[in-house]
């Protein structure tokens, strides 16, 4: 998304940043776009709140998975956006299986971060079977997207 927005602005600095974000999300996520735009807004608003209200800054080495940034309510809201997004594309399962699969993995790429936040910060709120299911899907998605570490130079996943 950032590459799309920045490249458009390089060609025309009079374009509206937020309109470009919406344009990208609408084309990339199709029917799920309203949920992904809401997901984007929650993340943006959470960072803005932490910087402007709580006076917390997040440098390159900051722990951006902390509960200060991602409290339970925010994590739940992000999770619900993505579940709703997955439900919104269900019609493509039979009508256009190739598009369905493409959209599922685009949405599930975002789910990786949400699973990580939930597993690391809020695991006590979930049953052991629900948590195990999240961890298993996290590892499956990490493998699919060839993600092997949480941070550069890190040793892997903490669970």
Provide a role label for each language-model segment:
Residues 2:
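Catalytic cores of enzyme domains
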Residues 5-159:
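Catalytic domains of carbohydrate-active enzymes that cleave complex glycans
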């Amino acid at each position: 998304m950032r590459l799309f927005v920045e490249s458009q602005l390089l060609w025309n600095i009079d374009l509206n940043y937020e309109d470009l974000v919406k344009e990208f999300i609408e084309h990339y996520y199709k029917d799920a776009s309203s949920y992904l735009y809401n997901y984007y807004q929650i993340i943006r608003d959470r960072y803005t709140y932490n910087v402007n209200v709580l006076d917390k800054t997040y440098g390159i080495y900051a722990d951006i998975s902390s509960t200060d940034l991602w409290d339970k309510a925010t994590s739940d809201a992000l999770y619900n956006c993505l579940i709703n997004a997955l439900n919104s594309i269900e019609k493509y399962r039979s009508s256009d299986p190739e598009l369905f699969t493409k959209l599922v993995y685009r949405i599930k790429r975002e789910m990786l971060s949400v699973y990580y936040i939930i597993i690391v910060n809020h695991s006590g709120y979930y049953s052991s079977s629900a948590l195990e299911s999240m961890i298993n899907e996290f590892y499956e998605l990490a493998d699919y997207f060839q993600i092997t570490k949480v941070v550069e130079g890190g040793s892997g996943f903490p669970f």
